[in-house]
Amino acid sequence: ATPAYMSITGTKQGLITAGAFTADSVGNTYQEGFEDQVMVQGFDPAVIIPTGPVYGQ
């Protein structure tokens, strides 16, 4: 399978995935140019909307 790469940026946190995919963190699967991203090997596009009094619904 062909891997996908994703970066995550928070509104207040900035680049959350900074330094996530380095040779030190992933070993021999390291790919130059993807240092601030994470490798996505699977994805479930489900969206969960919390409901109930705690969430104002």
Swiss-Prot record:
A single GO cellular-component term on record: extracellular region
Location of the protein in the cell: Secreted
Entry keyword Secreted: yes
Superkingdom to which the source organism belongs: Bacteria
Predominant localisation class: secreted
Keyword hit for Transport: no
Keyword set, alphabetical order: Secreted
Extra facts: First appears in the mid-log phase. Present at highest concentration in the late-log early-stationary phase, before gradually diminishing. Significant amounts are still present after 30 hours.
Family: Belongs to the hcp1 family.
Subunit structure, as described in the record: Homodimer.
Protein name, as recorded: Major exported protein
